[in-house]
A protein has these predicted regions:
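Charged, glycine-rich active-site and insertion segments that engage polyanionic ligands
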Residues: 2, 10-167, 183-188, 192-230
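Conserved phosphate-interacting/catalytic interface
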Residues: 171
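TRNA-recognition modules of translation machinery and tRNA-sensing kinases, especially anticodon-binding
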Residues: 176
Length: 230
């Protein structure tokens, strides 16, 4: 048997020379919107859905696939962008944050339960059992572990953080678009939130460049703290 070790680092210079000299370096890049859209189309999604999911995912194939196949997740993102653009008071932010957390928990719990049901069905199929067959005593422990309450709670907590992190990244995309407009760089890099172009254009006039950068930094700090919550 053979094994392949994949060592991941921000750059080759971040790897010790003694290790780097014994490896083959493969430089990865964020795929373009066109490449992601083409991949989604190859999976059977309509071109318009694939193109929008690719643009909103910012090169993340996993998130693009999620947007393309789950209309509810895409709708939640749309509502979040509108909500952030509509913030005027601190109380607005508190309400939006509360709704965001509630939606993240609900989405995480639903997805965890679906995956648990799929895992149970796979377990039955692999072991030659039908949907209504009794689980043999020797397999019962492994079967019950699939939907163990503590394990499901742990998975839901982790997935909730993933959903919140994705939401924070979506919020950051607003101020990224603001910075793009302020620097007249739309032709070079394009906008992510094209559907909200009018509101983002207005925000780019009201908010100075320093304010846009500060908000991006604040969101980045929130993401780091969220990821550090274990």
């Amino acid at each position: 048997p053979h094994a392949i070790w994949l060592l991941c680092a921000p750059s080759a210079q971040d790897v010790l020379p003694t290790i780097r000299s014994r490896t083959r370096i493969v430089n990865l890049a964020v795929p373009s919107n066109q490449a992601v859209a083409k991949f989604l189309e190859s999976q059977g999604f309509e071109p318009n859905i694939a193109a929008r999911a690719a643009r909103l995912s910012e090169g993340h194939i996993g998130i693009a696939s999620l947007y393309a196949k789950d209309e509810r997740v895409m709708t939640d993102r749309d509502e979040l962008i509108v909500g952030v653009l509509g913030l005027h008071r601190a109380s607005d932010a508190v309400l939006l944050a509360g709704n965001l957390i509630d939606n993240a928990k609900a989405q995480a719990e639903a997805e965890v339960n679906v995956k648990a049901s799929e895992a149970e069905a796979d377990f039955r199929r692999i072991n030659g059992l039908g949907p209504k067959d009794r689980i043999p005593p020797k397999l019962r422990g492994a079967y019950n572990a699939i939907a163990k309450k503590d394990e499901l709670k742990r998975r839901a907590t982790r997935l909730t953080r993933d959903v919140l992190d994705r939401a924070l990244n979506s919020a950051a995309s607003i101020y990224r678009d603001v910075a793009v407009l302020q620097n007249n760089a739309e032709d070079a890099v394009g906008l992510i939130n094209l559907e909200n172009r009018s509101a983002i254009t207005e925000l780019s006039v009201r908010l100075d460049r320093t304010g846009a950068v500060r908000r991006l930094e604040d969101i980045a700090t929130a993401r780091r703290r969220l990821n550090g919550n274990g």
